[in-house]
Amino acid sequence: MNKQSEKLAKAIAYEAKKKKERDEDKRPAFHVTPTTGWCNDPNGFSRFGEEYHLFYQYYPYENKWGPMHWGHCRTKDFIKWEELPCALAPDMEYDGQGCFSGTAVEHEGKHILMYTSVLEKDLEDGTHMVRQTQSIAIGDGENYEKVTENPVITADCLPEGSSPVDFRDPKIWKEDGRFYALIGSKAEDGSGQLALFTSEDALHWNYEKMIDQCKNRYGKMWECPDFFALDGCQVLIVSPQFMRAEGLEFHNGNNSIYFTGDYEKETMTYTRGDARQVDYGMDFYAPQTVETTD
């Protein structure tokens, strides 16, 4: 997969130029940092082959937020990280305003990235349209190509009242021969909810149900969900916007919280307990987990 759009080629060339100019002695020795420019959410944290890949929200051209790309690096030991070329650029109509957050999974020797594609445009009636959809790119660990089926999931299949503007951050995983995706959504009252989808091929998806709804109990929009089994429990991590403080908890506004609960796979039913903070710092948001070989 060596196809590169003009925007992606431009980003990769800019990275190469800035790498020659930067002072390596001033870069962190262990922490992942962008090749150049801006980064925020970690994306696509996953095992592929014998290595672990980490992508991130990325704007290479300035030290501030801009149209989101996906930066890329990999490691074998989580100490030494190898920088790789920019993996995704906002180069299609459906993602022209950004390749927002997402996750990744290995399948049959290929690395599948699932991300939120953002479209904005002015309509003939004078209104401004924003749409967040979900898209797929498939690669070999270094080069990735967006599929012709994109966007593979839109908000059209969601329950009435669900926002097509706030529909993002897919968590993709594979289990028992099927693909699953858990995606953040906003209900009509502005509260967060999590939509569950299934697929046989990661390209054609079926909406199953809202697996959880916060009903304004824990903030508003739930961003960047993570969902995994741990020590006999099913853990759900979300990053709610506009959390209200409760006693000594949730004082950082936009938090990352986790629930432990039970998940019934046959009925796709999740029963959760109370929320706990993942971290009490002011700058901790949108974490991702990966299952290692040990």
Regions inferred by a protein language model and the residue ranges of each:
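Beta-rich, blade/repeat-based domains predominating
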Residues: 170-171, 224-227, 286-291
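Beta-rich carbohydrate-recognition and catalytic domains
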Residues: 1-169, 174-219, 229-281, 294
